[in-house]
A protein has these predicted regions:
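Single conserved hydrophobic/aromatic residue that forms the stacking wall/gate
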Residues: 1-7, 11-12
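Solvent-exposed loop/turn segments at secondary-structure junctions
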Residues: 9, 37-40, 75-80, 123-126, ...
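Ligand-binding "clamshell"
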Residues: 13-28, 126-145
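A conserved helix-loop-strand patch within extracytoplasmic ligand-binding domains
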Residues: 17-70, 170-173, 177-182
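Surface-exposed patches in mature extracellular/periplasmic domains of secreted proteins
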Residues: 22, 59-64, 96-100, 121, ...
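A bilobed periplasmic-binding-protein/Venus flytrap-type ligand-binding module shared by bacterial periplasmic
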Residues: 30-38, 152-168
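Ligand-binding pocket segment of bilobal, Venus flytrap-like solute-binding proteins
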Residues: 74-139
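Extracellular/periplasmic juxtamembrane helices and adjacent flexible linkers that interface
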Residues: 159-195
């Protein structure tokens, strides 16, 4: 489809200087996950920043048992990693013990290690790990949609203002931003913004 791209938050920030329009079609909650045995129930964005940059290295400093924190994340280039690192303000400064190529691998690594912490898209998190609250707010479709859960990213259609979309491209954008697309967006693992 000519003149239509799908991106994330970066597109919104850059749209005015790049002469493009950004239309948010969905949101993705990025859940903070720990091993089910962890005593930690809630973390602040600031504590996450301190943990992922190596300033805090022991679980006892955030309410857990004594033990070295094992940071698990996605590989460089991952959209989930980019979203997490941008929101928590740890871009290029994380001290990962493991950088994995798939969300399922991150979840499995956290499940297998009682000292691990990682992040994953809300839709991928099941009952094998525990999603902690962030500043007292759980990661759920409702809290992502209402904005109270802080670690989330938008999925954005980006279109060039100086080019008229083709009929097919416009029809696709219209459908993707309609209530009719909500179930498809949810099935794909994101939170629809139009219902």
């Amino acid at each position: 489809i000519a003149s239509c791209l799908v991106g994330s938050e970066m597109c919104i920030r850059d749209r005015e200087k790049n002469d493009v329009d950004g239309t948010v079609i969905a949101l993705d909650g990025i859940a903070i996950i720990v091993n089910k045995a962890s005593k930690v129930e809630d973390l602040t964005v600031d504590k996450l920043k301190q943990m992922f940059t190596g300033e805090i290295t022991n679980w006892k400093d955030v309410g857990g048992d004594d033990g070295e924190i094992v940071l698990v994340g996605r590989e460089a280039g991952s959209g989930t990693r980019d979203g997490f690192e941008s929101i928590v303000d740890v871009k290029d400064s994380c001290k990962y013990a493991q950088e994995l190529t798939a969300t399922g691998a991150v979840i499995s690594a956290v499940e297998a290690n009682p000292l691990a912490i990682g992040y994953a898209s809300l839709s991928a998190v099941g009952d094998t790990v525990k999603a902690v609250t962030v500043e007292g707010v759980e990661c759920s479709e409702d809290t992502v949609k209402d904005g109270s859960y802080k670690i989330q990213r938008p999925f954005v259609f980006v279109t060039n203002k100086s080019v008229t979309l083709s009929e097919q491209a416009q029809a696709f954008v219209d459908f993707a931003t309609s209530k009719d697309a909500a179930d498809l967006i949810r099935t794909a693992g994101a939170v629809p913004v139009n219902e």
